[in-house]
Design a protein with these regions (language model features):
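Domain-level signature for soluble enzymes in the chorismate/prephenate branch of the shikimate pathway
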Residues: 1-325
Length: 325
């Protein structure tokens, strides 16, 4: 073999080695991802089962808080359809207990409003319930002022609604000078006005509630923010998630030490994830220590998301995934 032939032979061998090297790199990436998936699955998402879609059939029962015409009622219809079997309960806690007892397959709860912020106490209830967030829905909130047939805007003295409803319409209410009375639910206020038949009373609720309870809309869309929207979550006893889910909600506790939250946020930033919400809640019996509830855009099928969750778990206390949806 002359010198030129030997050079060509070496170049061919080098190219074969480069090709083989790239194949091994690709395999290592896949194996590394699989190892990470296995690690996080055993340590953090133990028990979670991926599904193609949530099971919903003619026997499925959904529970919501309030009465027909409430925004939770509307969110239920939006997510499950109008033909879904349903029950309604008086309190948010009752939604959780109804699902835990097996009397309902899914529960609907409001979690956050774009104008008034988080709905107080919901994350605490969900985090300690053992239930899983398996879905979510956003409902455009168009509050109406409604009274009994024949009443006029000038007759109104007292307005009933959920505290969030009153807060979201505070500018209109304060200008008008009405007495404001909180009730358990926006639609509950509509029921009260209908039942008492007093022309000086009005409710703030949805157009659906006005239609259901035969009330007249005295003034429409009275919210402070025309883009007012409420985010709802869907709860289940089953620890499952739809494979196409793109949001993950987690909770964890942090000690009262410098840099602890910064460290958590660093793991999110390092993995290129977007945090869409965060709420802190004081820990009972632990002065100046807090639990945090955060929602990330991510997937349990994604190595970057898995890496972030793994590190958050290691750097926090009582870490728990409360849902991916």
């Amino acid at each position: 073999m002359n010198t030129l032939e030997e050079i060509n032979s070496l170049e061919e061998q080098i190219q074969q080695l480069i090709t083989r090297k790239n194949e091994l790199i690709d395999r290592a990436c896949v194996e590394g991802r699989d190892i990470a998936m296995a690690h996080i699955s055993s340590d953090v998402v133990s028990g979670f089962v991926p599904v193609d879609h949530l099971k919903v059939d003619k026997d499925t029962v959904v529970v919501y808080q309030g009465v027909p015409g409430a925004y939770s009622h509307q969110a239920m219809h939006d997510y499950f359809g109008k033909d879904i079997k349903n029950v309604n309960v008086a309190k948010f806690e009752d939604v959780i207990e109804t699902v835990k007892s097996g009397k309902a397959d899914y529960g609907v709860l409001p979690i956050e409003n774009s104008s008034a912020g988080f709905v107080s106490g919901i994350y605490d209830m969900v985090g300690s319930s053992g239930l899983t967030i398996v879905g979510g829905d956003e409902v455009k909130v168009a509050h109406m002022l409604m009274g009994v047939p024949g009443s006029k805007l000038s007759d109104i003295q007292t307005v009933y609604s959920h505290p969030q409803g009153l807060l979201q319409c505070s500018e209109f209410l304060n200008r008008a000078g009405y007495a404001q009375c909180p009730v358990a639910n926006t639609a509950v206020g509509a029921v009260k006005v209908r039942d008492e038949g007093d022309i000086t009373q009005a409710a703030i609720a949805s157009a659906l509630a006005a239609d259901i309870y035969g009330l007249e809309i005295l003034k429409d869309d009275i919210v402070n923010n025309e883009n007012n929207t409420t985010r709802f979550i869907i709860l289940s006893k089953k620890k499952e998630y739809v494979k196409s889910a793109g949001n993950i909600s987690v909770c964890f506790a942090l000690p009262h030490e410098s840099g602890t939250l910064y460290s958590i946020l660093g793991h999110i930033k390092h993995n290129g994830l977007n945090m869409t919400s965060i709420e802190s809640r004081p820990l009972r019996g632990r002065k100046w220590e807090y639990s945090f509830f955060i929602t990330l855009e991510g997937s349990l099928m994604d190595p970057a998301t898995i890496d972030a969750l793994d590190h958050i778990n290691k750097d926090s206390m009582d870490f728990k995934i409360i849902g991916t949806y």
